[in-house]
Amino acid sequence: MKQYLELCRRIVDEGHWVENERTGKRCLTVINADLTYDVANNQFPLVTTRKSFWKAAVAELLGYIRGYDNAEDFRKLGTKTWDANANLNDAWLNNPYRKGDDDMGRVYGVQGRAWAKPDGGHIDQLRKIVDDLTRGVDDRGEILNFYNPGEFHMGCLRPCMYSHHFSLLGDTLYLNSTQRSCDVPLGLNFNMVQVYVFLAIMAQITGKKPGQAFHKIVNAHIYEDQLALMRDVQLKREPLQAPTFHINPEIKSLEDLETWVTLDDFWVEGYEHHDPIQYPFSV
């Protein structure tokens, strides 16, 4: 929580106003933030100064792992995070590549599980990483990359957190995740959970011990219609004791994650939090 609150305060105190063309709103912005999560010691980075819906964050990550491209599939997992971008984004609604209601296009997990090759085939990036790590192999390129400029026009949104680089030191697994842009009041609590959980679950299914997860954010911002709530409400609250995160030990493979795993296979103990804050969302 400390590093999260320090970033929020830094944006409020030192941020520069930037006009965002996509949303038509101004953002108070800083460049570069580095967060570290101690997965080895189960220091779960869940926000306590407002209620954080961690299950939706895990459900979204699970959808990425499965390569989903439809908001309905994400809803079935337990999150509505893609409803607006799939169905309320004017540019996407008028895009000839959109297949209909709830279609997201070739975003995030689609790129991770089926990156298009010039010859017409596909690359399953995640499968390759899991196979390598399971065998104890780190070729210095165990990178899951969602950022494919050649197909931006085929999706409803460019990826924000676009790269996850796994590294082995002995039998300990590390993760470096890079995020080009972050809506800090709304998105960062999700993203912190996802980086932490991604390392934890990948270590479990590859038979490795989790180490630290390193989370780099390039453009961290607070939208102008979120600023008062962040400055005058959330930042005035005292953080509470961090909870612990748990994964069903029966999850042992990528195939398990692709088939039978649900949100019931993840749980949090000791989560105390302040009241929710309804931050505005910008499509």
Curated annotation (Swiss-Prot):
Transmembrane segments: none annotated. It catalyses: dUMP + (6R)-5,10-methylene-5,6,7,8-tetrahydrofolate = 7,8-dihydrofolate + dTMP. GO terms for biological process: dTMP biosynthetic process; dTTP biosynthetic process; methylation. The active site is at C160. SUPFAM superfamilies: Thymidylate synthase/dCMP hydroxymethylase. It is found in: Cytoplasm. One of its GO terms (cellular component) is cytosol. GO terms for molecular function: thymidylate synthase activity. DUMP binds at R22, R180, S181, C182, D183, N191, H221, I222, Y223. The keyword Methyltransferase applies. Keywords: Cytoplasm, Methyltransferase, Nucleotide biosynthesis, Transferase. (6R)-5,10-methylene-5,6,7,8-tetrahydrofolate binds at D183, S282. It holds the Pfam family Thymidylat_synt. Its EC number is 2.1.1.45. Pathway: Pyrimidine metabolism; dTTP biosynthesis. PROSITE patterns: THYMIDYLATE_SYNTHASE. It comes from the Bacteria. PANTHER family: THYMIDYLATE SYNTHASE, THYMIDYLATE SYNTHASE 1. Homodimer. Catalyzes the reductive methylation of 2'-deoxyuridine-5'-monophosphate (dUMP) to 2'-deoxythymidine-5'-monophosphate (dTMP) while utilizing 5,10-methylenetetrahydrofolate (mTHF) as the methyl donor and reductant in the reaction, yielding dihydrofolate (DHF) as a by-product. This enzymatic reaction provides an intracellular de novo source of dTMP, an essential precursor for DNA biosynthesis. Belongs to the thymidylate synthase family. Bacterial-type ThyA subfamily. This is Thymidylate synthase. It comes from Vibrio vulnificus (strain YJ016). The gene is thyA.
